[in-house]
């Protein structure tokens, strides 16, 4: 399918090419309206809306566990039923009702697949009007015709098209006042007037729909520590034994049966005063009170609804002429008017409609050569060639350089667990964990005793006087409602009328509280109090309903490397590779066998003369005597040729790392942690359901005048106005611009050919000739382009208001406009409706008890009251006596899930357990919450050219473009043949009387022409320019790896390559044992109140009262969110405990990585020695065979060249390379993107974490001595190294500061390049890395040096 964008591009290009290549072709009819444009990019997110009204109350919460009746009766006295007791006082609120609480908002879902292309959008707005055409060539002036005889009166012609604007006449007399002009455009908003007097309060408006649920307010600061919860049942106190040695963890025993319930403890002391009971039912309405004093005037109310239209006003004065309105639609053709006075000869008419489509023009020039297309896909591998003839065995090559570190081998199977290792020291304290998620809703707590009575609050200001609502009809009698929680304090009743003054009676004794009366009828609404001060921040609301899925999030981060693909097909043999980069240091190999003996060295220098011996007697020639003492060592021989590489040595003995011990016993639960920090603001909740519509409000005051609305649709033509006074003839106007050439009319009848006269000289322009006879009416030409707007006409009479146009189709959503300036201060609005009831004030002092009212009729069931405040902790009951343990029974079948136990006292802090084994990958967590809308993305890169689109359906006709300029006068066409008389049209409205024109000459009677037919539609346009390329598509999945191809020819040995990248992450290990139970999270928010319980009734102590309501709790709802959160936290903790060596999860040292992943091989990994933020992690090479962490220099090679020429004849001395020769730049060790300062910090930590360090430097030489001078046999020309703590490392001297040489190829001046490998190992890591080197034997024109700086390795 062709996309919509392509179609638009095709049409645009078609129009462009058509205009370029077809200048001579006449213009076709105006094309249909183009298809709508693409939807613009998303606007900038708007400002947050104002907080909506509070939503309706949520559904009731889940039922709480039953209360514990243990302290309310004594089982020892329960054998006989007691007498029916009197009705007890109203019980505490019952357990919550059954509907469950609203779940937490789900985690955000994964991004959905891209949706299918949507349907074609609605038609877009009309395109902009086209440019005006170029002026035509000026026509020749016609010859003046002879004046013909006056013809007979012609038939009444059709009303002519309006002529061009006439010349400006002489200023006429002032006409009489015209009719009232059309209303002008809205004026600029005037300044705010002074505030008017307060209007009388309007009637209460209809209750507005509930606003959207307001945002969850910011979390309050951590509250003071709550009162302790009720203590659990006290167990028998055992003697405190001495702490035993930790034993091995035993196997978990089978779950024991529940022991028999213990006897009830003695009755506890009387509890504190109970909570206030629920408000009693309303008593009967009292007599009306005395009329109250007048309330304070209320603030100005909000603007009311627009009032009913007023009566028509008096006619206004004449309005300023409005701007010319848009042309109305053509009226129906009017009846033929009376013949007008013959007008002067009109100018050439406007250009007619385009003629029929001409023949297709010649093909346009070929376009430019297209851009080079993208590279095609790689071709499939060719077939493998035939195997070549086996070559002759080559001679044995020299030993190659150390190979690169091999790729990561497949993970080995997990070894068996070893014996438990010795207990390690306690690890460092871990970082504080992230604040936990909001806990699940807690079970309702036990009712506490009442707090002390609060102080009497200050008197509130007087409220707005409310209007009494109409009394509703009495509802049907409902079932008795359950007792709700105490409701908020009701409003004051209206003052009653003055009663007759009674005689004062004697004060009676205070009566006993009477029984609760039945609910009275609802009293009339009291007067509204004055607006109270803003209440404190309310508690966080219950979690909102599940939000709709959010929009697709931004592209996620790059995913982890995919799993290894399946082997691909054999590839063709590769060509010889280029010389590779320097490889990472290989793992230390075992010692090789001794190489063959080197060639004999040169003879040593002759030894010194021995002491003169005593002369001996001449003896016989003896046999060979024993060998004499060894001579003085000869000069150092040249290095022998390297021996062949020895076989790999046997594996060394196992290291000290023990096998992981068995899992330790589960430690006791830790103490509850402090409450976490306040959570961030929650997402904005959904709007609550719409409330019932209220009573219609009173008519509001008229609003301020609104800004000018958009121009309405053009109304129908009004009735003709009365004829104005004839104005005096105006002055001649300036010459109009040249009109466009009219399209030629059809050919007229051939005239008789006159004799051709000789060309005379051009005469001067003659006077205007008389009008020639009118030609026959030609076929109507096509409608020309709209002319330029004429000068504004006089304001005509305003027509009647047209019918409202149909609603236009909704335009596409525009981009967000810039934020407007703050509006001017508006006038104070009228007094608003009475606000919702403010929070209850503090309880006033208790009044004297009233006399018991008569029992009212039982009221309808009330709505559930708000939850009361939590009471203080009750006194703990006394300890029960210990029951004897029963005999062990057989193991029963699994019982139903028991109720959650009460929170135990915190146990002692357990020892840190050893790290658990790797867990299995967790299941996917529930979808996360919707992310916030992303900011508007930047404009994407241009996309590739899309395929050509199909031609769209013709759009609706566009609106008329602006009038074009007047064209130059065109040539007159020849008269056309007479047309057939057309049907007479309906009579049009009489036009206003025009200005009297000059008397015209009589024209000949013309025949009536035919109506022309509508021209054909123009050709479809050529393809448009290519659209902007679309956004880059998502990367394809990695294809499978092919099988290993045949080996290519051996390349030349490369340089030592740099260290390779770290291998792919190994497979996830088996799941480790569960960790110790973490500290309890902060307490969750209190649960919503439940439904009230049934009435207590009489108490009957039946037999065996050992059952509690809490033994059969209703099934606890599954808490998937908590499970998913715990699983996610476990995974995050495992990631922290077992670092991956990645940039996001670096280890501290390579040793930590090896301990966490013993199966991993050496390679590059990320570490963060100073811990903390991972943004300064460094990439290092981990040598797991030696346990070293190696940091490379940057750069690690110094160019080999002549760095210094000694121009003086002074003796040579050591010159520091970095400080003197290299412009003050010493050797540096830091990653790209990491500053030297950050790297210095990491190196400082690395030195603290290590107790050994080593580094080597390769000195490349040409005619320069690095270590041993072969001529002198001494080390006086050896280089000096500078350590990181400014210590100088030399070839000889103190052994702690001397380096060793692994290979010395720079012992004499040979004119060839050689190298010397220097190594320094130390138990003082602070001396490394090496920062500078000072050679001595340099300065000659033929002396060149360079360096390779090896990695510094810490262990």
Curated annotation (Swiss-Prot):
Per the UniProt record, the lineage of the source organism begins with: Eukaryota, Metazoa, Chordata, Craniata, Vertebrata
Supply the alphabetized keyword list: Calcium, Collagen, Disulfide bond, Extracellular matrix, Glycoprotein, Hydroxylation, Metal-binding, Pyrrolidone carboxylic acid, Repeat, Secreted, Signal
Q: What domain of life does the UniProt record list for this protein's source?
A: Eukaryota
What is this protein's name? Collagen alpha-2(I) chain
How does the annotation summarize its subunit structure? Trimers of one alpha 2(I) and two alpha 1(I) chains.
Q: What is known of its domains?
A: The C-terminal propeptide, also known as COLFI domain, have crucial roles in tissue growth and repair by controlling both the intracellular assembly of procollagen molecules and the extracellular assembly of collagen fibrils. It binds a calcium ion which is essential for its function.
Tissue expression from the record: Forms the fibrils of tendon, ligaments and bones. In bones the fibrils are mineralized with calcium hydroxyapatite.
Listed Pro residues bias regions? 276-290, 1080-1091
List residues, modification 5-hydroxylysine.
168
Q: Name one GO biological process term.
A: extracellular matrix organization
Q: Which organism is it from?
A: Aquarana catesbeiana (American bullfrog)
């Amino acid at each position: 399918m062709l996309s919509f964008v392509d179609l638009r591009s095709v049409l645009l290009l078609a129009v462009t090419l058509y205009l370029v290549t077809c200048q001579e072709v006449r213009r076709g009819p105006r094309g249909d309206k183009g298809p709508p444009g693409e939807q613009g990019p998303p606007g900038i997110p708007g400002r947050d809306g104002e907080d909506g009204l509070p939503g309706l109350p949520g559904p009731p919460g889940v039922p709480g566990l039953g209360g514990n009746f243990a302290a309310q009766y004594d089982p020892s006295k329960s054998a006989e039923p007691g007498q029916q007791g009197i009705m007890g006082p109203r019980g505490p609120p019952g357990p919550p009702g059954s509907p469950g609480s609203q779940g937490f908002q789900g985690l955000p879902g994964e991004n959905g697949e891209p949706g299918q292309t949507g349907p074609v959008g609605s038609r877009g707005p009309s395109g902009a009007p086209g440019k005006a055409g170029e002026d035509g060539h000026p026509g020749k002036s016609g010859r003046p015709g002879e004046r013909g005889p006056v013809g007979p009166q012609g038939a009444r012609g059709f009303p002519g098209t309006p002529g061009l604007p006439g010349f400006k006449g002489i200023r006429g007399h002032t006409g009489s006042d015209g009719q009232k002009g059309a209303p002008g455009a809205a004026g600029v908003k005037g300044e705010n007037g002074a505030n008017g007097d307060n209007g009388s309060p309007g009637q209460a408006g209809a209750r507005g729909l509930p606003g959207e649920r307001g945002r969850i307010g910011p979390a309050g600061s951590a509250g003071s520590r709550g009162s302790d919860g009720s203590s659990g049942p006290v167990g028998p106190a055992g003697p405190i034994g001495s702490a035993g040695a930790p034993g091995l963890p035993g196997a978990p025993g089978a779950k024991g049966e529940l022991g028999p319930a213990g006897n009830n403890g003695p009755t506890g002391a009387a509890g504190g005063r109970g909570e206030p009971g629920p408000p009693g039912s309303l008593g009967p309405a009292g007599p009306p009170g005395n009329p109250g004093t007048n309330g304070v005037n209320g603030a100005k109310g909000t603007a009311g609804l627009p009032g009913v239209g007023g009566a028509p006003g008096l006619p206004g004065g004449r309005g300023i002429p409005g701007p010319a309105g848009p042309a109305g639609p053509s009226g129906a053709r009017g009846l033929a008017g009376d013949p007008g006075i013959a007008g002067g000869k009109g100018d050439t008419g406007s250009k007619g409609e385009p003629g029929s489509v001409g023949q297709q023009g010649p093909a346009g020039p070929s376009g430019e050569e297209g851009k080079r297309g993208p590279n095609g896909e790689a071709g499939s591998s060719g077939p493998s060639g035939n195997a070549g003839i086996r070559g002759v065995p080559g001679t044995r090559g020299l030993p190659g350089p150390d190979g690169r570190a091999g790729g990561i081998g497949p993970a080995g199977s997990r070894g068996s667990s070893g014996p438990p290792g010795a207990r390690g020291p306690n690890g460092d304290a871990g970082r504080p964990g992230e604040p936990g998620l909001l806990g699940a809703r807690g079970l309702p707590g036990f009712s506490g005793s009442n707090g002390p009575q609060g102080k009497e609050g200050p008197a509130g200001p007087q409220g707005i006087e409310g209007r009494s609502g109409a009394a509703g009809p009495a509802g049907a009698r409902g079932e008795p409602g359950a007792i709700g929680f105490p409701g908020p304090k009701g409003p004051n009743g209206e003052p009653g009328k003055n009663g007759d003054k009674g005689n004062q009676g004697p004060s009676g004794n205070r009566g006993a509280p009477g029984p609760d009366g039945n609910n009275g009828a609802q009293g009339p609404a009291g007067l509204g109090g004055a607006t109270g001060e803003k209440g404190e921040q309310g508690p966080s609301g219950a979690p909102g309903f599940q939000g709709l899925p959010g929009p697709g999030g931004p592209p996620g981060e790059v995913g982890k490397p995919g799993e290894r693909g399946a082997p691909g097909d054999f590839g063709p043999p590769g060509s010889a590779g280029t010389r590779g980069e320097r490889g990472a240091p290989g793992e230390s190999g075992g010692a090789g066998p001794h190489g063959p003996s080197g060639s004999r060295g040169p003879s040593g220098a002759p030894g010194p003369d021995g002491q003169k011996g005593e002369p001996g007697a001449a003896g016989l020639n003896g046999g060979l005597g024993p060998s004499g003492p060894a001579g003085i060592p000869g000069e150092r021989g040249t290095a022998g040729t390297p021996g062949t590489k020895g076989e790999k040595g046997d594996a060394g003995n196992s290291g000290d790392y023990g096998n992981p011990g068995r899992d330790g016993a589960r430690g006791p639960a830790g103490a509850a942690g402090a409450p976490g920090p306040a959570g961030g603001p929650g997402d904005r909740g959904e709007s609550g359901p719409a409330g019932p519509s209220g009573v219609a409000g009173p008519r509001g005051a008229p609003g301020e005048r609104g800004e000018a609305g958009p121009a309405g649709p053009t109304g129908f033509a009004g009735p003709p106005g009365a004829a104005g006074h004839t104005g005096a003839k105006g002055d001649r106007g300036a010459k109009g611009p040249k009109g466009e050439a009219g399209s030629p009319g059809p050919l007229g009848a051939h005239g008789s050919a006159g004799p051709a006269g000789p060309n005379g000289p051009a005469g001067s322009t003659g006077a205007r000739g008389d009008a020639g006879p009118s030609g026959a009416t030609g076929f109507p030409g096509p409608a020309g382009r709209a002319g330029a707007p004429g000068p504004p006409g006089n304001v005509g009479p305003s027509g009647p208001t047209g019918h409202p146009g149909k609603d236009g189709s909704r335009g596409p959503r525009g981009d967000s406009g810039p934020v407007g300036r703050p509006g001017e201060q508006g006038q104070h609005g009228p007094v608003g409706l009475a606000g919702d009831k403010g929070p209850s004030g503090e309880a006033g002092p208790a009044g004297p008890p009233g006399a018991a009212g008569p029992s009212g009729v039982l009221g309808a069931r009330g709505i559930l009251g708000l939850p009361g405040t939590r009471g203080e902790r009750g006194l703990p009951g006394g300890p029960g006596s210990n029951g004897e343990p029963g005999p062990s029974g057989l193991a029963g079948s699994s019982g139903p899930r028991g109720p959650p136990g009460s929170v135990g006292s915190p146990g002692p802090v357990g020892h840190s357990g050893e790290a658990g084994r790797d867990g299995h990958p967790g299941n996917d967590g529930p979808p996360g919450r919707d992310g916030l809308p992303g900011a508007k993305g930047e404009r994407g890169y241009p996309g590739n050219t899309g395929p050509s689109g199909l031609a769209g359906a013709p759009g609706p006709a566009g609106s008329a473009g602006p009038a074009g300029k007047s064209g130059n006068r065109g040539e007159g066409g020849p008269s056309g043949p007479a047309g057939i008389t057309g049907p007479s049209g309906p009579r049009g409205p009489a036009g206003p009387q025009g200005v009297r024109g000059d008397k015209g000459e009589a024209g000949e009677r013309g025949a009536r022409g035919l109506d022309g037919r509508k021209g054909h539609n123009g050709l479809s346009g050529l393809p448009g320019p290519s659209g902007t390329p679309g956004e880059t598509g998502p990367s394809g999945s990695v294809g499978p790896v092919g099988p290993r191809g045949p080996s290519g020819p051996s390349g030349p040995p490369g340089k030592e390559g740099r260290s390779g990248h770290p291998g792919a992450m190994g497979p996830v290990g088996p799941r480790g044992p569960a960790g110790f139970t973490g500290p309890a999270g902060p307490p969750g928010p209190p649960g919503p109140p439940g439904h009230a319980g049934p009435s207590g009734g009489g108490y009957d102590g039946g037999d065996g009262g050992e059952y509690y309501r809490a033994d059969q709790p209703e099934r606890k709802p599954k808490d998937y969110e908590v499970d998913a959160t715990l699983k996610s936290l476990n995974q995050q903790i495992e990631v922290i405990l077992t670092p991956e060596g990645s940039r996001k999860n670096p280890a501290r040292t390579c040793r930590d990585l090896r301990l966490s992943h013993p199966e991993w091989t050496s390679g590059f990994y990320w570490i963060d020695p100073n811990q903390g933020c991972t943004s300064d992690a460094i990439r290092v090479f981990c040598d797991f065979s030696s346990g070293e962490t190696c940091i490379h220099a940057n750069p690690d090679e110094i160019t080999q060249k002549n760095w210094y020429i000694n121009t003086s004849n002074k003796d040579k001395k050591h010159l520091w390379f970095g400080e003197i020769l290299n412009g003050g730049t010493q050797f540096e060790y830091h990653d790209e993107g990491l500053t030297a300062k950050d790297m210095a910090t990491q190196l400082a930590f690395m030195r603290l974490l290590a107790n050994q360090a080593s580094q080597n430097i390769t000195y490349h030489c040409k005619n320069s001595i690095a270590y041993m001078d072969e001529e002198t046999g001494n080390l006086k020309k050896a280089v000096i190294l500078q350590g990181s703590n400014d210590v100088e490392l030399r070839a000889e001297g103190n052994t702690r500061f001397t380096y060793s040489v692994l290979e010395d190829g720079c012992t004499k001046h040979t004119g060839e390049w050689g190298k010397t490998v220097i190594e320094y190992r130390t138990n003082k890591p602070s001396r490394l890395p090496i920062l500078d080197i000072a050679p001595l034997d340099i300065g000659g024109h033929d002396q060149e040096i360079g360096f390779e700086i090896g990695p510094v390795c810490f262990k």
